């Protein structure tokens, strides 16, 4: 009788997972350069869409991720700027269980950021990028979890633009395979 009415706590499954990522991007202001002149821009909020695949080892997760970041910006003397960044990352995340369903997470990711900035001219480049992550996860079911994370993101500078950096708030789902 007791088993029938006791709520079931989902088991944590170690192994492979994948899932979508959706985020709010708060990019820091930066600058684009043409020769010796530097044009500062003010960033508007943007979005992040992506997918992640990884392996859960218990207290450690290793994952690969593709993410697309987009935001608009204003250049004071020239109008608007559109930014799009394609990221290919690997990430290592440490997790600490808090009870049966909650996890605290911290990690670091690194990879390649392919940056495209467009106004009347195009500023393109690819380079090293990295991020730091802090967040929490909640297990909804045996094979489904949700994570809410904060990331600080940074790419390398290029001849045509400054570092792309900013704050990202993410919501991701993990479907255990």
What is each PLM-predicted segment?
Residues 16, 47-49, 86-88, 104, ...:
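Hydrophobic core residues within well-ordered beta-strands of beta-rich domains
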Residues 31, 66-74, 132, 138-177:
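Predominantly the C-terminal beta-signal and adjacent terminal strand-loop region
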Residues 1-57, 110-112, 117, 168-177:
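Short glycine/proline- and aromatic-enriched beta-strand/turn motifs that initiate or cap beta-hairpins
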Residues 52-120, 138-140, 169-177:
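Gram-negative (and chloroplast) outer-membrane scaffold detector with strong preference
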